[in-house]
Structures are given as C-alpha cells and as structure tokens.
Curated annotation (Swiss-Prot):
Single strand-specific metallo-endoribonuclease involved in late-stage 70S ribosome quality control and in maturation of the 3' terminus of the 16S rRNA. It is an enzyme of class 3 (hydrolase). Binds 1 zinc ion. Zn(2+) binds at H114, H118, H124. Keywords: Cytoplasm, Endonuclease, Hydrolase, Metal-binding, Nuclease, Ribosome biogenesis, rRNA processing, Zinc. Belongs to the endoribonuclease YbeY family. This is Endoribonuclease YbeY. One of its GO terms (cellular component) is cytoplasm. The keyword Metal-binding applies. Its EC number is 3.1.-.-. It comes from Shewanella sp. (strain MR-4). The lineage of its organism: Bacteria, Pseudomonadati, Pseudomonadota, Gammaproteobacteria, Alteromonadales. The gene is ybeY. NCBIfam families: rRNA maturation RNase YbeY. GO terms for biological process: rRNA processing.
Length: 153
C-alpha cells in the first residue's frame, strides 16, 4: 500500500540548508508507513522567535525548540485524513546537528520522523513509551540510510 500524501511545506525562515519538499515527503512517508492510506500534513519551518512563541504558548516553555507537533483531532464520527502540523525551528535543528556531530540532513530527517510519530500518537514521557518510540525512530532513520540518532557520537 502506498501512502497518498498531501504535504504543505511552509518556509517561514531562511537558512543555509533547508530540505526540499521532496525530502520532507520521503521522510513523512517513511514515518507514517502503512498506518494510513491517506494523510494531509503541514510542515512549517520557522525561526527561533516563532518557535519560542509557540513553545511558550502551547508547552509553557519560554525557549525555542526543535519540533512541535500539533495533531488534528476530529470528532469520532468524522473521518478525515488530516494528520496535523509540524513546526520545526531551523536554527535549533542546525545548532543541535552541530553539537551532536550529525549532518544537517540526518538531523532534519530525524526531527520529521520524530514529529510524525508524535502525530501518530507516540510519546516519550514515560520510560517505556520513550524506549518504544526511540526504537521505532532508530529503525525508520536507519531505513533512510542514516545512523542511529540516539547513538553517542
């Protein structure tokens, strides 16, 4: 089964390296896999200011963050393929990639996969949930040809 993906990528900031819409689509399709036949998703690439504002408003943390996930929740009687929105801060992703000695492409892929898994209902608050989510992330990232994102460099 192939995922029918409607992806809207919004580039709301400039940077030396931002993935293409094709890269984002590949990473989203890899993360979603066979869990849905159709999916609609928006990925918004933002600067630190917008990320900090959203993180403060929705998570009570007054600092920019790498990725925020906003799942769409329709009433039970309504079936829509709308998965939700990801907001990714380019500056934070770049800084983390440098600090973790990863390529930008690998870290962007990881953030997209991580965010999509949140949209699918995965979480990492409890240790057991975190282990399950990280294991799945690692499998997906490695299937894309990147190394384990949680392996110490």
């Amino acid at each position: 089964m192939s995922l029918d993906l409607a992806l809207d990528v919004q580039y709301a900031t400039a940077s030396d390296y931002l993935p293409s819409e094709e890269q984002f689509a590949l990473w989203v399709k890899t993360a979603i896999g066979n869990s849905m036949e159709q999916a609609e998703l928006t990925i918004r690439i933002v600067d630190s200011r917008e990320s900090q504002m959203l993180n403060s408003t929705y998570r009570g943390k007054d600092k920019p963050t790498n990725v925020l996930s906003f799942p769409f929740e329709a009433p039970p009687e309504i079936e829509l393929p709308l998965l939700g929105d990801l907001v990714i801060c380019a500056t934070v992703v770049e800084n983390e990639a440098r600090e973790q000695d990863k390529t930008l492409e690998a870290h962007w892929a990881h953030m997209v996969v991580h965010g999509c898994l949140h949209l699918l209902g995965y979480d990492h608050i409890e240790d057991e949930e975190a282990e399950e989510m990280e294991s799945l992330e690692t499998q997906l990232i490695e299937s894309l040809g990147f190394t384990d994102p949680y392996k110490e460099q």
